[in-house]
Amino acid sequence: MLKIFNTKFIRSAPVVAAVWLSLTAGIIIEFNRFFPDLLFHPMS
């Protein structure tokens, strides 16, 4: 199992970028689910 993570494909830039963007999107979605109005502040 650890041999899979040591290959060059998993460490390549598109895979790392896809994992990073998915993680960031998940964090933003969950934050917006628990605190719905904190991401978009009104201009008042």
Curated annotation (Swiss-Prot):
Belongs to the PsaJ family. It is a single-pass membrane protein. The gene is psaJ. HAMAP family: PSI_PsaJ. GO terms for cellular component: photosystem I; plasma membrane-derived thylakoid membrane. The keyword Transmembrane helix applies. The keyword Membrane applies. NCBIfam families: PRK02733.1 (NF002743). It is found in: Cellular thylakoid membrane. It comes from Prochlorococcus marinus subsp. pastoris (strain CCMP1986 / NIES-2087 / MED4). May help in the organization of the PsaE and PsaF subunits. Keywords: Membrane, Photosynthesis, Photosystem I, Thylakoid, Transmembrane, Transmembrane helix. This is Photosystem I reaction center subunit IX. The chain crosses the membrane at residues 9-29. GO terms for biological process: photosynthesis.
